[in-house]
């Protein structure tokens, strides 16, 4: 008989007081200890264990949204089965219903990785060991890769269980072979495998049934919650699925294009550019203050640039502000001679009030001045 090798028994670390005391953050090697607890709980199985026992087992070690995946290869090709939290209890129960009396997992050189909210355990040399008592005492060793994801909290429950089976072996004690060495029929029966790829017919049939049961979990849950008929549950689920399919995908928020500020030409600059010729032609008739009127109509002030890190576009340009002087307009009162002459500051005898003599009067005065000479 082969010796059973379950590996070294995990020791309680100093920080662990006793089972049942909650802790907010798990200690080191907590994943190994959870596998040890799972094996210990499976060893407590008896034939009297009912559905409530298996549901309590699953609640203790699996999350509410846990997914269990089994992959293996049969004669007709590779198989992959994925079941949810509701069907996980029946999966472990089917192993014992298939004739197994004991179940445990042996992990060699597992690799533990910490992530944001979960801890992953990857073991490339995992062995699932089951012992069968019928029709003959047989130990089945299923070798494969086991990948687990534990939630990083005080409960450390499994969220993802993925077991990829590579090969299996069925071991029989030598004593049994010696007892039936003279019986050819018994030796022929002992030479046949009792499992397929390490799984019993009960487990394989249940996994095939899960292909139908897993999609129906939504219907069953809706039936229990709303007490609808199966036909109404199916119509509601199909309608919601159709809505999810035809609903347009949410467009990502588009960033508004940056609008560049257009610099508008001010009235003073327009006058200075468009009326430049007029200013040159009438420079003899107007006072020099008229040029000051064009340049002092408005004041262009350049603001400070924004700080580093601002958005490109509006904010990174210098802000140009137009300040209008409404109290003083140099153009008023320069070209209008009537308003200038009617000023109250000018008296009746003011020299500024006298008009220059006309050309005819100057001609009439010239002959008299020559005659007097």
Swiss-Prot record:
Post-translational modification: Undergoes rnf12-mediated ubiquitin-proteasome-dependent degradation.
Keywords associated with the record: Developmental protein, Nucleus
GO biological process: positive regulation of DNA-templated transcription; positive regulation of transcription by RNA polymerase II
GO cellular component annotations of the record: nucleus
Keyword Nucleus: yes
Keyword match Cell membrane: no
Cellular compartment(s): Nucleus
An example molecular function term from Gene Ontology annotations: LIM domain binding
Comp. bias (Polar residues): 288-297
One protein family per Pfam: LID
Residue span, LIM interaction domain (LID) domain: 298-337
Chain positions covered by the region annotation Disordered: 248-297, 329-373
Amino acid composition bias (Low complexity), ranges on this chain: 266-282
Subunit structure as annotated in this protein's UniProt entry: Forms homodimers and heterodimers. Interacts with and activates lhx1/lim1. The stoichiometry of lhx1/lim1 and ldb1 is important for their function and an excess of ldb1 can inhibit lhx1/lim1 function. When bound to lhx1/lim1, escapes degradation by rnf12. Interacts with the N-terminal region of rnf12.
Family in the record: Belongs to the LDB family.
Biological role stated in the UniProt entry: Binds to the LIM domain of a wide variety of LIM domain-containing transcription factors. Acts as a coactivator together with otx2 to stimulate lhx1/lim1-mediated activation of the gsc promoter in the Spemann organizer. Acts synergistically with lhx1/lim1 and ssbp in axis formation.
Domain notes: The dimerization domain is located in the N-terminus.
Protein name: LIM domain-binding protein 1
Designated gene of the protein: ldb1
């Amino acid at each position: 008989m082969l010796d059973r090798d379950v590996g070294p028994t995990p020791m309680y670390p100093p920080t662990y007081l006793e089972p049942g005391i909650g802790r907010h953050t798990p200690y080191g090697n907590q994943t190994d200890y959870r596998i040890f607890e799972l094996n210990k709980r499976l060893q407590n199985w008896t034939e009297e264990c009912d559905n409530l026992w298996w549901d309590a087992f699953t609640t203790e070690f699996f999350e509410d949204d846990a997914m269990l995946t089994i992959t293996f290869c049969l004669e007709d090709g590779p198989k992959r089965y994925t079941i949810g939290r509701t069907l996980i209890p029946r999966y472990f129960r089917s192993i014992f219903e298939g004739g197994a009396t004991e179940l445990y997992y042996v992990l060699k050189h597992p690799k533990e990785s910490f992530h944001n909210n979960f801890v992953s355990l990857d073991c490339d040399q995992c062995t699932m060991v089951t012992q069968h008592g019928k029709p003959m005492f047989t130990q089945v060793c299923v070798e494969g890769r086991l990948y687990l994801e534990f939630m990083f909290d005080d409960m450390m429950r499994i969220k993802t269980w993925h077991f990829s089976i590579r090969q299996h072996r069925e071991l029989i004690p030598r004593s049994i072979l010696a007892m039936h060495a003279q019986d050819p029929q018994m030796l022929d029966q002992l030479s046949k495998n009792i499992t397929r790829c390490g799984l019993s017919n009960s487990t394989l049939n249940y996994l095939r049934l899960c292909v139908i049961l897993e999609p129906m979990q939504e219907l069953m849950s809706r039936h229990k919650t709303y007490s609808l008929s199966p036909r109404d549950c199916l119509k509601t689920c199909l309608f919601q699925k159709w809505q999810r399919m035809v609903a347009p995908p949410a467009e990502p928020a588009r960033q508004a294009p940056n609008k560049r500020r257009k610099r508008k030409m001010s009235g003073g600059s327009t006058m200075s550019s468009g009326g430049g010729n007029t200013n040159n032609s009438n420079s003899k008739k107007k006072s020099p203050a008229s040029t000051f009127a064009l340049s002092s109509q408005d004041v262009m002030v350049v603001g400070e640039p924004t700080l580093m890190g601002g958005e490109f576009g509006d904010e990174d340009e210098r802000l140009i502000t137009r300040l209008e002087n409404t109290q003083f307009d140099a153009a008023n009162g320069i070209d209008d001679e009537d308003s200038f002459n009617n000023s109250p500051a000018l008296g009746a005898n003011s020299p500024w009030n006298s008009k220059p003599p006309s050309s005819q009067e100057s001609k009439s005065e010239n002959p008299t001045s020559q005659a007097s000479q």
